[in-house]
Regions:
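Radical SAM [4Fe-4S] cluster-binding motif and immediate context
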Residues: 147-308
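Radical SAM enzyme core and accessory elements
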Residues: 2-6, 26-27, 31-34, 46-55, ...
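Active-site beta-loop-alpha junctions enriched in small/polar residues
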Residues: 58, 87, 168, 218-220, ...
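Flexible glycine/acidic-rich beta-alpha junction loops that bind and position SAM and/or redox cofactors
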Residues: 88-92, 175, 224-225, 280-285, ...
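Short, electropositive alpha-helical surface patch
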Residues: 228-235, 320-337
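Glycine-rich beta-alpha loop elements in corrinoid/cobalamin-binding modules
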Residues: 2, 10, 17, 21-142, ...
Length: 487
């Protein structure tokens, strides 16, 4: 069988969600080709070649762009079988012929081969939570079928750039934050990726030039003993390789005994979903932390020389102007201006189907109709001025970043827009904070500009993307985001 696997957006990383199923399919004798629309142009000849095509949709942005691409396939090859797989697979139900979520690899192989349904599926047959990833002997992810690492996001540190690899040591999450897409599929469960499989994939990426590894688990400390073991072994084998990971505030504090070893093993920064400084909002989201906990987590990581890169979701149905101001003051007071990509000051809660927030009693008064084109429910703030402020800040950040302004300069512009005095930091004040050239998001709804450009010519190198989602392709996320993974 000639199988075409397509990725549309994976945060600027070389798509693991193509490499793993490609390896499994190839090991079973199938002819597999991959296309990553983050960096590759659309190729109708590949569509003509394929016997079936499957789209990887690990997040909302990827799903929305996949809808555009599927429409192209339907025009060219109406009869071609199409699958959508990944965390957001179910969002393509009715658009793709087969949709799969959760632990998708075995189910995708079964679909390609037309075999019977597998054990581990839910009643819908969509969500699969088998434990294949923990089994030894799986083939190495087929990264040879993907564009080289140097075409993807890089680490910026000390005025230089380093090539970045990407792995996942676990899937799912033990927590059920209401705004996160992960519990919709995993429902508080995690699936461990076999230890040696993770290390072997790291090794092949180091051989390909990676000098930094991103652990893309929804929360790297969900299986803390497993993660420590992986980090320890990676550092023993590759002592010069650095890394970053995503960790929930609650876990930063609970597992504070790991940070000394992580720092000594090359941990440069931790992504953590702070979301809001309003404790009532954090409670509604079931985040499991408070603003005071966030401050403590910054101090814990800093004590070990590890930077924190917070993600924020300032605009929810409960947001007030005072909340926005308090968030900006928190960033300033804790010396985090250079650690926050300015787009995070503009992010608005996204509510896809299945969101655990939909049945929250305090959401009902703000919830509007489902928008099929956006793939999410519309909602409104009680004060229309808050919705207007979000749009104004989004336009401001877009314009400033497009003009090449530095992070401190953009931050001061945002502060001025909400009536706060500028901090007056030097434009270079953020230069010594390690970051990736791709802004970190979980799930973002792309702008109309992105979707139009993706439909016309979906090609843009992630390495050249800006801090915010205003490039004319799928290489960067937009300002409208589902909350980050539980971190």
């Amino acid at each position: 069988m000639r199988v075409l696997l397509i990725a549309t957006y994976e945060l600027g990383h070389q798509p693991l969600q193509l490499a793993v199923p490609a390896a499994r399919l190839r090991a079973r004798g199938h002819d597999v080709r991959c296309r990553d629309l983050q960096v590759d142009a659309w190729d109708p000849e590949l569509v003509a070649w394929a016997d079936c095509v499957a789209f990887s949709v690990p997040m909302h942005t990827a799903t929305q762009i996949a809808r555009q691409a599927i429409a192209r396939v339907r025009v060219q090859r109406p009869e071609l079988p199409i699958a959508g797989y990944g965390l957001y697979g179910e969002m393509l139900d009715g658009i793709a012929d087969r949709v799969i979520a959760g632990e998708t690899d075995a189910a995708l192989v079964a679909w390609v081969e037309g075999t019977e349904e597998l054990e581990g599926a839910d009643e819908s047959g969509i969500v699969h939570l088998g434990r294949d990833a923990a089994a030894p002997g799986a083939p190495l992810p087929a990264r040879d079928l993907l564009p080289p690492l140097d075409r993807y996001a890089h680490l910026v540190i000390d005025g230089t750039e380093r090539t970045v690899g990407y792995v996942e040591a676990s899937h799912g999450c033990a927590h059920r934050c209401r705004h996160c897409p992960v519990p919709v599929v995993y429902d508080g469960r995690i699936r461990i990726v076999e230890h040696e499989a993770v290390l072997a994939d790291i090794a092949q990426q180091v051989d390909a030039g990676a000098r930094h590894i991103t652990f893309g688990d929804p929360d790297f400390l969900n299986g803390v003993h497993h993660s420590v073991r992986v980090v320890r072994a990676m550092h023993e084998r590759f002592p010069d390789v650095t890394f970053d990971c995503t960790v929930k505030v609650e876990h930063v504090l609970r597992h504070d005994d790991v940070w000394a070893e992580f720092a000594a093993s090359g941990c440069l920064f931790v992504v953590s979903a702070f979301e809001s400084v309003d404790d009532a909002t954090l409670t509604r989201l079931d985040k499991g932390h408070t603003a005071a906990d966030m401050a403590r987590s910054v101090a814990v990581l800093r004590e070990h020389g590890i930077a924190v890169r917070p993600s924020w979701m300032p605009f929810t149905p409960w947001t007030t102007l005072d909340h926005i101001r308090a968030l900006l003051e928190f960033v300033a007071e804790h010396g985090l201006v250079g650690n926050v990509d300015p787009v995070h000051y503009t992010i608005r809660l996204l509510l896809p189907r299945g969101s655990l927030l939909l049945d929250h009693p305090e959401m009902q008064a703000h919830l509007d109709e489902y928008d099929e084109a956006r793939g999410s429910y519309r909602w409104h703030a009680p004060d229309p001025a808050i919705d207007e402020l979000q749009q104004q800040l989004a336009a401001l950040v877009e314009a400033r970043v497009a003009a090449g302004d530095s992070i401190p300069v953009v931050s001061d512009a945002v502060r001025a827009a909400v009536g706060l005095a500028p901090l007056g930091l030097a434009p270079t004040a953020a230069d010594d904070v390690p970051r990736l050239t791709e802004s970190w998001f979980c799930c973002a709804e792309p702008t109309a500009l992105q979707l139009d450009a993706a439909a016309a010519a979906p090609v843009q190198s992630a390495r050249n993307s800006s801090l915010v989602a205003f490039q004319p392709a799928a290489s960067v996320p937009s300002i409208v985001k589902n909350a980050a993974p539980p971190s």
